[in-house]
Amino acid sequence: MRLIRYDRDYSRRHFLKSGGLAVAGVLAPLWKVVARDGNVIAAYPDELLSIEGYTRGKISSGDEITAANVELVKELLEPVKYQQVAALGRRLRVVPTTTDIMRLSPWEYIEATLRNRGQARFDERGNVITADGKPWIGGNPFPDAASAIELFAGQTLSWGRHDASFYAIKEQEISPEGVVQFQYESGWAEMSPVARIRIDPKPYWPGRQDKLRFQSIFYQTPDSVKGTAFLNVWPYDQHQFPELYGYIPEFKRIRQFPTDQRFEPLIPGSTLYLSDAWAAGDPLYTWGNYRIVGRGPMLSAVSGGWNAEHPNWEHATHGGPKGKTFWDTQVELVPEAIVVEAEPVMFARAPVSKKRVWFDARTALPLAMVSYDRRGDVYRSFDGAYALYESGGKTFMDGAHPYWSWTHVHCFDSQTGRMTRLEQVRSVSGGHATSVNDGTVYDRYLTTAALMRLGSA
């Protein structure tokens, strides 16, 4: 008979006692353990490191969570995902918990986080700077986050955790009846001129230290939106809105758009807003009243989401009225998630009253987001899946290490029943292929000239 030193009640008491503090780890401070061991095992009791231990054998790795057994793990799911499993036919395949920290974010990002740990602070305007007053230099500035604002600051600084990314994306819009009403192919590009850890010059791109990121999205199919493109240029000052430029093929010119209209879909049928990106799609201080409202274990898709068996990395679907509403998804027991709420403070016409984001305490990665309408009712949800891109003997490389990134996303409108599904694929029409830390992404995708070129191609 195996003796259990720390049961679920011990963990619950710890999380309740922690209250509004964000410092992670149950048995020991998490990032002290990570710096020493490279994994998280010594920071958590066994019962938080396996679904078998947590459910006392009622659910095991390899099992599927369905409407028949979801009540056993209801407390481990955000409310919208629970309802999707309980009522809409969503299924979740359980896999073992990942404890190696290097498999949960890009390798160099974790190295930079460890190397630069303890050097970040906020300046008088609340922007993240180094101890000597310069823009941030790379990695998560607050791995030992002690507050909600530190968690969100780290995520806002670096969405994809690479210096540059180009994501080839396929997107489907699903009606409440389960019908695929729209299908899009697009490209999403990001580049950081500060906090660079891979692309020279680093950590800063000279002359652009006043910018946080360049980000664009353009559409390749269908013909009704082909050539439509948008470019966001983010100031480093997180009180300022990005500059938003767009190219609309019908007008054959670049125009500048109001940048505070971030709660509207860019294309017909979509439930995805600019504000949703990485659960931190707006400048940090356009939201406020950040607060930690909960913490505890969670089931989330932080590994195994890459479909290496498909030549274009495309994923299978299930559930809903026609079996097309949800991506097939693998989830694992995340030993500790920190739940943060925030309210929009610089959006006079925002349709949301607040958002709630679940962060993986190990990496400060956003696991899920639920927003609430002005009445306080559940409105929309956003949940993603991540992976190290190695599976079944196949690997997609990022320099010396396997690529780490998101793999697929659900964006669901709980009030209308509409679903937007996105997946990162190998390539889309026009020869645009997923790439990482490629310095040419700026000239190809992140200038107004690039938008015009893409729009007329």
Locations of regions flagged by a protein language model:
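N-terminal secretory signal peptides
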Residues: 1-14, 21-29, 36-37
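Solvent-exposed N-terminal domain segments of exported/luminal and surface proteins
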Residues: 38-241
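Extended beta-strand-rich segments in extracellular/periplasmic secretory proteins, especially
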Residues: 113, 117, 186-208, 215-221, ...
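A generic structural motif
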Residues: 218-222, 245-249, 343-345, 372, ...
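Short glycine/serine/proline-enriched coil/turn segments at secondary-structure junctions
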Residues: 224-225, 237-238, 332, 347-351, ...
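Acidic, serine/threonine- and glycine-rich low-complexity intrinsically disordered segments
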Residues: 230-231, 236-303
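Cysteine/selenocysteine-centered motifs that mediate thiol-based redox chemistry or coordinate metal-sulfur cofactors
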Residues: 291, 297, 396-449, 454
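C-terminal soluble interaction/assembly domains
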Residues: 348-424
